[in-house]
From Swiss-Prot:
Protein's UniProt keywords contain Chloroplast: no
Entry's family note: Belongs to the cathelicidin family.
Keywords carried by this UniProt record: Antibiotic, Antimicrobial, Cleavage on pair of basic residues, Disulfide bond, Immunity, Innate immunity, Secreted, Signal
Encoding gene, per UniProt annotation: CAMP
Disulfide cysteine pairs (residue numbers): C86-C97, C108-C125
Name of the molecule in the record: Cathelicidin antimicrobial peptide
Native species: Pan troglodytes
GO terms of biological process kind: antimicrobial humoral immune response mediated by antimicrobial peptide; defense response to Gram-negative bacterium; defense response to Gram-positive bacterium; innate immune response; neutrophil activation
One cellular component (GO) term of this entry: vesicle
Lineage top rank: taxon: Eukaryota
Amino acid sequence: MKTQRDGHSLGRWSLVLLLLGLVMPLAIVAQVLSYKEAVLRAIDGINQRSSDANLYRLLDLDPRPTMDGDPDTPKPVSFTVKETVCPRTTQQSPEDCDFKKDGLVKRCMGTVTLNQARGSFDISCDKDNKRFALLGDFFRKSKEKIGKEFKRIVQRIKDFLRNLVPRTES
């Protein structure tokens, strides 16, 4: 014969199981890395395996390809890393390190998974031609010069327009 107490106990267990069912998908979602986080984790692995003296840091990340929603499916990635001033033996994060002037640039391609618990990567990096690094520096410097010139032109236009306004004499 069931008692009222048994009914409350069964109701509590049902409630606990229902809450667990609602919370578990949230825990799984929280363990999925973003595309960039997965690439940064792969770069950490590259730095650990590297025999080079200094750490590498993300220089350029190619746009994220269209992907399925399964975090366990390997996702294609391609990015460029550049040598930093920080020695590989440091405990410092590569993101906190400045790029080394004329540092080695590597082009990396492969796959990463976004599952944080079982995250994996298969990346290979090739030394980029020096021309590529110089080209990147050229574009960066050109952008700075164009920005300065643009500001100067805007200021000259403003000055010209101010001079067009009729002046009233007091």
